[in-house]
Amino acid sequence: MKCLNNSDIEKELQRLGRTYLTGDLKNFTDLNYIKTSGLEIGISKYEEFKYDKAHLHKWNNEYNYVLEGEIKVYIFSEAKEYHFKKGDLFNIEPNMAYMTKSIAGTDILFVKSPGGNDKSLIDISDNNQFLEWTKSWEEKMI
């Protein structure tokens, strides 16, 4: 049997704000994660308001379950903002460009399948509306 204990998970979340619990990881982590292929599971913890840079995943389906707090997700291809709260689940499909912002106290459990580092950043530096959206929770996309 393989397992991870809460104190090790919490220590890594305090250090980085995000940790992978399972996967075949290439990036450095102090957590002795459970090595798997075909699936990655992790947690993101946002102690304060934060936005994640615009990006897409080339081949991963990403499922996100809101454990605590709230998150807004902007999907570029739909030109639409979604608002998710505690208990909500949402799926980001492969090649779906998006950006997120979370209020303080938000925790997300994420699952990526089939796994692997496929993140590709999207440059929004020339779009003032997108940049303004990332600065505050209240800012809405028109």
PLM region spans:
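A short, N-terminal "cap"/entry segment at the start of jelly-roll beta-barrel domains
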Residues: 1-45, 51-54, 126, 132-142
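Short histidine-centered beta-strand/loop micro-motifs
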Residues: 31-34, 43, 52-58, 75, ...
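A generic structural signal for short beta-strands and their flanking turns/coil linkers
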Residues: 37-42, 52, 61-62, 67-69, ...
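Conserved hydrophobic/aromatic beta-strand scaffold that supports enzyme active sites
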Residues: 41-45, 63, 81, 89-91
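Histidine-centered metal-chelating micro-motifs
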Residues: 51-53, 72, 80, 89-90, ...
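A short beta-strand-loop-beta hairpin characteristic of the jelly-roll/cupin
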Residues: 60-86, 119-123
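A short, sequence-level motif marking secondary-structure junctions
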Residues: 86-91, 127
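Ligand-binding loop in jelly-roll beta-barrel domains
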Residues: 94-121
